[in-house]
């Protein structure tokens, strides 16, 4: 042994004090320090508020992303205790408030006191103290017993003692924090991720209002999640745009004694005419993605209840056809939720519930309710049974089709499917497969690829829309069969094996036209419905071939999007131009001109935010009344004409008072200060937002250093932008690519396939509920929801982006 080697004895054992352990090993407490861990911080704080709601003391939670990137979570619960904590004070030799204990000591909180919380989601008791430890800045405010209190921390350490702010009529807790950039790879909160979880919590906790606001986006309306129907509303939401077999979801609720106290069970279910099963399970509001005893008990009871009803009423269609749980769950949408005093989760991530007593409670309550429901509703029961038998027959047909496909694949395994051009590398981690639209582009991709690790699979035309097809039809589709065989990982719940995937990057490469978009959507629908693990594990990517090639003399560049092209042309046009305001003779050039141009672009962003709410800008301008523009819009009920504009917060409150249901329908057109700031900045130049479309009277003369180009007078702000873009076009050659086949092999490699230069979009699943909703609406059988979606988004489409 090296004499210099340090001795490993008791002196080498380090004890991390307080929250230092959390900062040293954050992954042990929040999973990771990436996007998932960042949002987990918010969930930990929100869960505390929801626990207050579950205990009956809180009715509203407000989550707000601040303009500067911080986030606040407030509730109207009891408020964290602020009295002196005698035990911890004696231990540390100074007076310490209960608030400081909760925020700085691991495994401290009311959740271990069964008199305070019978059930809670924050099982480990490390939540809010972890958030404090991993925050650069953390401020807690408590509103309790008529007084407001505050305490500030940084990276888990107190910066102040408990401060008394003064009297208040509020009650509850407010937490404001800024994640520590020294810990997290990103500190930018994703609105979609947060909204998914908040919507879920509102469904699971009937009667609790959860408000979400995002101050970073001036065009974003606050969202209010409130569902009086609870998980019944959740099932109805999931079945939106689907053809349901009966009107109202079946609902069951009950409580039974468990090993550690009463177990509360709740479930709602409803069948639709589709082919996908959609079941979400929860324990103490925590998603149990791998199920557990509560889901097993429910599924067992469901299968038994259906089979018993068939047997009792002699409804069997064939002695040779045995029904499975898979048949019964085809087209089923269900939510299963339990509240357990002492939940036992398998693994730190709480993905699976393990309490054995929960399974028997779940099975007992489900069985009783379903048996009674089927007997009392024979017509609905018969409709369900008919669907189950059709599903069983389709399963047998799909099994035969699968076996035929597998036999064919085995015979063809030496050369793999059809036109697959495989790569030399055999390690899946290093391999990628391009799914390419058309033989022409496939040929260019074959010539341009790096054959060591890039495989090419050309597909012809539009593949089957699997949203409208049973599994046997999927197996019979030639293009889908080629994809299944090429990937090698199988298909379907029972036959999919991710470890057999031959390429860890599957890249969809289609044309930039409407057909290309349609093919891409069909492929994504297939992967989402039948190989969802590929999306969950982020194996699917979308290639970003350029839309334009711009050349000037010998120089050229590729441009990916219409927005990038507009910016490029505007930048070129602005560089060598100057403007003169004809009324004041004030001239702008260089940075001063860029500032003015950027201000006009802010006006355009404001217009886009209005049009996303289906408010035409010209109509908005016409609504100018008594020196003010409208602040809110109250849309008409579905199918009716004529909405109304509201000009103040008082008018909005009056509308809500007259009709409480209007609260969720009233749109905030913009944050109050946004338009005010725009008008002030435009006023510095003698303009206002009306002048984007309407002339002021005097013009703006644009000139360049090029003597061949005469000065041009613009009379609206829009005209200034359009003219500068036009100047940017002079002297350059623009080629717009409509298809991949228009690029040669070298161009395709340089722009879309070279790992050093290409841009890929990774397909991830942030919100499974919303993804299901969108795929059903856009790709499903029901036409009216799709028409309504298209009509409501029509104003957001730029005419030059339409492929007509």
From Swiss-Prot:
Site positions (Interaction with DNA): 462, 465
Binding residues annotated for Mg(2+) 2, in chain numbering: 511, 513
Names of required cofactors: Mg(2+); Mn(2+); Ca(2+)
Chief subcellular location equals: cytoplasm
Q: Which UniProt keywords apply?
A: ATP-binding, Cytoplasm, DNA-binding, Isomerase, Magnesium, Metal-binding, Nucleotide-binding, Topoisomerase
Write down the Gene3D superfamilies for this protein, in alphabetical order.
3.30.230.10, 3.40.50.670, Histidine kinase-like ATPase, C-terminal domain
Give the top-level enzyme category: isomerase
Q: Where does Mg(2+) 1 bind?
A: 437, 511
* Cellular compartment(s): Cytoplasm
User: What's a single GO MF annotation on this record?
Assistant: metal ion binding
Q: Which domain of life is it from?
A: Bacteria
The further comment given in this record reads: Few gyrases are as efficient as E.coli at forming negative supercoils. Not all organisms have 2 type II topoisomerases; in organisms with a single type II topoisomerase this enzyme also has to decatenate newly replicated chromosomes.
Please describe what this protein does. Answer: A type II topoisomerase that negatively supercoils closed circular double-stranded (ds) DNA in an ATP-dependent manner to modulate DNA topology and maintain chromosomes in an underwound state. Negative supercoiling favors strand separation, and DNA replication, transcription, recombination and repair, all of which involve strand separation. Also able to catalyze the interconversion of other topological isomers of dsDNA rings, including catenanes and knotted rings. Type II topoisomerases break and join 2 DNA strands simultaneously in an ATP-dependent manner.
How does it associate, per the subunit comment? Heterotetramer, composed of two GyrA and two GyrB chains. In the heterotetramer, GyrA contains the active site tyrosine that forms a transient covalent intermediate with DNA, while GyrB binds cofactors and catalyzes ATP hydrolysis.
Q: Which NCBIfam families match?
A: gyrB, PRK05644.1, PRK14939.1
Q: Which HAMAP family match?
A: GyrB
Identify this protein by name. DNA gyrase subunit B
Underlying gene: gyrB
